[in-house]
Amino acid sequence: MPSVGLPGAQGDDQVTGTPPVTLVCCGVIGTTVSDNGMVERAYSEAIATQGVVTGTSAYARSMAGVHRSRGQYTLDVMHSLFPENQPRAQAAQLAFDRSYGAAIGRTGVAAVPGAELALDKLRGSGVRVCLISGFSKKVFASVLDALGWWDKIDLAVSPDETPRGAPAPDLVLTAMLRLGVDDVRETAVAMSTEAGVKAGRRAGASVVAGVLTGTVPDGRLRRAGASHVLGSVADLPDLLTATGPAEDLAGR
């Protein structure tokens, strides 16, 4: 299968044995899709259905927890907010899905500038593309429907299809298994959240790029384990085809 070489690689690296990349796993909100505050509003509306309303200390604590948990499965986030009450957590997650789905219906969603072209470049070079989300499968499908992206990717994986969501490696490993990747090092991951970066690291991907179009700054992405930091996912095809030493492309 055609592939994109890692920085400095021509086919298999004779020194390290690193194979070329044949699969790219990208995050969605903040990585390939602009947020525009929709996720935070949906969380705010969802926890309000459980009596946690703006202007209260409980609301401030809950939203701080939401911000720390970006990239994680929405149900896992709700369980962390309502740890002693699973029915409340599940009800809040369903409310999140309704709220975010309604927001898509009202305003749609927009791709990060250059993201669509990046996906086209990757697939045009023979690399398979999987999008990975912290949304439920239903909400994720609504996002892809709104963007018209089903024909731009090879696979979409949601955490309700896997044993665990990010930061566990299950989403990335599931993509590898479903798309027949023989070696975990054939995979590159691009994520805008700490949870997503950790998932890529734990899955053994050879490139784990942090992306700065989300809400997480450079330093936190690096501490989470990013091997590279990109200003945008639009820089990812160039990173994977670079012939010189690996370098950050932030801000380019």
Task: Please describe what each predicted stretch is.
Residues 43, 115-145, 200:
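Substrate-recognition element of Asp-dependent hydrolases with the DxDx(T/V) motif
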Residues 188-228:
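Acidic, Mg2+-coordinating phosphoryl-transfer loop and its flanking beta/alpha structural elements
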Residues 5, 17-117, 121:
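N-terminal helical cap/lid subdomain that shapes the substrate entry/recognition surface
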Residues 53, 150-154, 182:
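Conserved H-loop
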Residues 1-26, 248-252:
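Non-catalytic pre-domain segments flanking phosphatase-related domains
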Residues 166-195:
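Conserved Lys-Pro-Asp/Glu-containing loop-to-beta segment of HAD-superfamily phosphomonoesterases
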Residues 164, 170-172, 184-185, 217-252:
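Short acidic, glycine/proline-enriched helix-loop-strand junctions
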Residues 32, 111, 129, 189-190, ...:
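Conserved SAM-binding loop
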